[in-house]
A protein has these predicted regions:
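Glycine-rich beta-to-alpha transition loops that act as phosphate-gripper elements at the mouths
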Residues: 1-6, 26-28, 48-54
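Active-site beta->alpha loop and helix N-cap motifs at the rims of alpha/beta catalytic domains
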Residues: 1-3, 8-24
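Catalytic cores of alpha/beta
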Residues: 7-15, 38, 52-68
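Glycine-rich phosphate-binding active-site loops on the catalytic face of alpha/beta enzymes
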Residues: 9, 21-30, 65-87
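Structural preference for beta-strand elements that scaffold enzyme active sites
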Residues: 18-19, 43-47, 67-68
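Conserved, mostly hydrophobic/aromatic
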Residues: 20, 60, 95
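C-terminal helical cap(s) of enzyme catalytic domains, especially alpha/beta-barrels
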Residues: 78-104
Length: 104
């Protein structure tokens, strides 16, 4: 669960939160929608999950109101079940490199 509309952001603010999980990011409209929601909430940062992957995570991370991204592409269930931890290590290292490239 997470925020996916302005009413949810308002509720988070009522609880004193300034960082909210935004879910499901891509099905809800992606970065364009997050930017539209974020505009009036200048003190709120977002952590999108849901549809984030190696192909689109860079664009999310370039937006200064994104504090972090979640993505299951790095640790898929089939990789865990098959014990393919080397692939998980490779994918998480790639994700960390993307973060370092964008955020320093």
């Amino acid at each position: 669960p997470g925020t996916c509309n302005p009413s949810n952001v308002e509720t988070a603010l009522e609880f004193g939160l300034d960082v909210v999980k935004f879910f499901p990011a891509e099905p809800a409209g992606g970065l364009k929608y997050i930017k539209a929601i974020a505009a009036p909430y200048t003190g709120v940062c977002f952590m999108p999950t849901g549809g984030i992957n190696a192909e689109n995570v860079k664009e999310y991370l370039k937006y200064d109101r994104i504090i972090a991204c979640g993505g299951s592409w790095m640790v898929k269930g089939d990789l865990i079940k098959s014990g393919n931890f080397e692939k998980i290590k490779e994918l998480t290292a790639e994700a960390a490199a993307i973060v370092k490239e964008i955020r320093g």
